[in-house]
Amino acid sequence: MKALAKLKKQPGIWIINDAPIPEYGYNDVLIKIKKTAICGTDLHIYNWDKWSQNTIPVPMITGHEFAGEVVAKGDGVTSVDIGDRVSGEGHLVCGQCRNCRAGKRHLCRKTIGIGVNVQGAFAEYLVMPAVNVFKIPDSISDDIASTFDPMGNAIHTALSFNLTGEDVLITGAGPIGLMVVKIARFCGARRIVITDINEYRLQMARDFGATVALNVAPFKNQDELVKQMRKVMSDIGMTEGFDVGLEMSGINSAISMMLDVMNHGGKLSLLGISAGDISVDWGAILFKGLTLKGIYGREMFETWYLMTSMLQAGMDMNPIITHRLHIDEFQKGFEIMKSGQCGKVILDWSS
């Protein structure tokens, strides 16, 4: 089968045409891939950064955001049928630890990821345990379903706390941050402010309903950044701090600024992964009585049900997809992702 694989311990990704079709077991399904989306994690692997060097076995078929069709299944599978349109939860868990047995599979200590630790979805076929497979409603397109993984991250982050009527600060306007703007607006947030240094994506955020999309690139230090943010808050009629902070960037200055402008009793969801150490103002957390929640992946499968229901109720995520390419144009897709001048990039695996 055709696949994209990390074949060498250096920047890049390579297409192969002779990868074996994976074998499926008693409780597995074999999925024919229709669409995949390129994730920031895939870009890290492509660039072969320090995290990738320490994490990714080589050779490895990568990718974990997908939509496809069930073409075969093990004898023990009763939850899906051949012909079903599906996506799937890319975190594989042990099923035996305390959290798994308590129904908190997203907190499994032994989580491994498809396309990171085991064969991924950048291939014509993928094998996945049936328990990880999620059927796609007819009203949802393959393109949108291929983004369920990052959309689930956005849903988990945004809906960890009530957003209705609240003032929300989002730091980081990558594709997941942009999804969060859509979610917060759909859920009735009062004011939504988002920060980034990428003007292309900030304009997308404005189009998606952000009250203010602030380019923080011009500000030379933390004091200038906080001063400008307080001016923004005043300009839009805020007399107190933000009620909810959604941190998507992993950038030290963004986190510090967020802590500075949160209201007393504010709540923060933290999804962004830092490339290095983060200095934290514990005084702000303590004296403001802030609540912090770390986010890793999606709640299985409550997050999936929530995002499906919201899409069916009219939340429009189609504008997040800015580029659609055939798999043979994968190199162009990765270059577009590297440029940052995009939302989600979808790869079509049809012949």
Curated annotation (Swiss-Prot):
Cofactor detail note: Binds 2 Zn(2+) ions per subunit.
Binding residues for NAD(+): 176, 196, 201, 271-273, 295-296
Main location class: cytoplasm
MF GO annotations: L-threonine 3-dehydrogenase activity; zinc ion binding
Gene Ontology cellular component terms for the protein in this record: cytoplasm
Keywords: Cytoplasm, Metal-binding, NAD, Oxidoreductase, Zinc
PROSITE patterns xrefs: ADH_ZINC
Catalytic activity from the UniProt record: L-threonine + NAD(+) = (2S)-2-amino-3-oxobutanoate + NADH + H(+)
Entry's localization field: Cytoplasm
EC number(s) stated in the UniProt entry for this protein: 1.1.1.103
Cofactor: Zn(2+)
Residues reported to bind Zn(2+) 2: 94, 97, 100, 108
Catalytic residue list: 41, 44
Pathway: Amino-acid degradation; L-threonine degradation via oxydo-reductase pathway; glycine from L-threonine: step 1/2
Site keyed Important for catalytic activity for the proton relay mechanism but does not participate directly in the coordination of zinc atom: positions: 149
A Pfam family hit: ADH_N
Biological process annotations from GO: L-threonine catabolic process to glycine
SUPFAM superfamilies assigned to the protein according to its UniProt record, in alphabetical order: GroES-like, NAD(P)-binding Rossmann-fold domains
Amino acids binding Zn(2+) 1: 39, 64-65
Its biological purpose: Catalyzes the NAD(+)-dependent oxidation of L-threonine to 2-amino-3-ketobutyrate.
Family indicated by similarity: Belongs to the zinc-containing alcohol dehydrogenase family.
Quaternary structure (record): Homotetramer.
HAMAP family named in the record: Thr_dehydrog
This protein's name: L-threonine 3-dehydrogenase
Source organism (scientific name): Francisella tularensis subsp. mediasiatica (strain FSC147)
